[in-house]
Amino acid sequence: MKVTIVGTGYVGLVTGTCLASRGHRVACVDSDAHRVATIARGAPPFHEPGLTELLGSALRDGRLTVGAALEEAVADSDVSMLAVGTPSREGRIDLSAVEAAATAVGRALGRREEYHVVVVKSTVVAGTTDTVVRRALEAGSGRPAGAFGLCMNPEFLREGSAVADFMRPDRIVVGCWDARSAAVLDELYRGFDCPRIVTSLRNAEMIKYAANALLATLVSYSNQVAALCEAMPGLDEETVMTGVHLDRRLTPVDGAAGPAGIVTYLRAGVGFGGSCLPKDVDALRGLAAERGVATPLLDAVMAVNRQRAGQVVTNLGAALGGLAGRVIAVLGLAFKPGTDDVRDSPAVALIQGLLAAGASVQAYDPLVRAVPALGGQVALPPAPEAALAGADAVVIATACPEFRSLDWQACARAMRQRVILDGRNALRGVPLPEGITYLRIGLGAPAG
């Protein structure tokens, strides 16, 4: 099939590239000329394992093109996917980019006769596709929905494994205006072997939010367990949660399958972040407030998450006898390993707390080269050893695998004081030199 992707951000470019690799002909459209030029050279504007190779192959084979001409792309395609951003504004998502994209696609539809399906890939609250998007398409095209197709097809891509997630999805959810729209999406995803849900537009929108809210809840639940373990002698959150994970309702017991993926969210740390979970939970709370529905559980999820980085700062200050004038090394800046995304990263919140307490910070992440939110207040040396040089303590804020293989003997010699606060329990089991004070998340004092 011929597919137009409107927006070349994370979702748009991964979706377009992967569809092209599955044999479809894809035109990615973006109004950012610099971004278009970068992608046309085969260079994704963000880090995602496997994407560069797939993109280069699709460009060379002519299965994927990138440009700014939306009308021409829509005129020559069967499906248009809206994959533009929906940033959060005080607990409400900003739909201006979605509405503008739908209006532009609508105008293009008004100039063609053939049936065309518009698919919303952007994460939007329930009721958006059949109101905001539909009305913009109808106004732009001068035609009613049904004359063109309309679907909501949420993405479930995890940064750091998005290509694999797209190619081997655990489910495909399609919300549709009518059966004809659904049939086109069924053809688009032919060959994908996974459960499919064909439902209403609003159910499809809500499935995405409900899924992300559950994951966020698991993280905050684990951090509440960790806080209690830290407050009581003899408790260890990692051991406690390992025992929880082994419940057969969470982990298969057939001897072949490993732990279910969901238990990876049942681990304590410095909190959740990124472009999805915080924004989506807040948007769900905002939608509920508009309808007069109380959300005490989701309110608590966000409150716990906001507190977590501050608690880590407090714990470190207690270990050092204060933070004013201290030099703190922070390892990890992205919100999770395997990505360069620092949006709403707990590591950034942690660093801001350290700076507010009077510490100076030098930070390292294997993929991150700049953190605009920190405004140049933090040194970003090119190697982890340089970040640790002269530090009073090191905080591990992101569980990057390479941190386990550092020469911790040499790192300890380079530090002024030898304190490690492992905010992700990433070094558990790693031999550390004598004389290091190693503090883990969720570990209480020794039992008397």
List each model region and its residues:
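Structural/interface elements that position substrates and couple domains in central-metabolism enzymes
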Residues: M1-G448
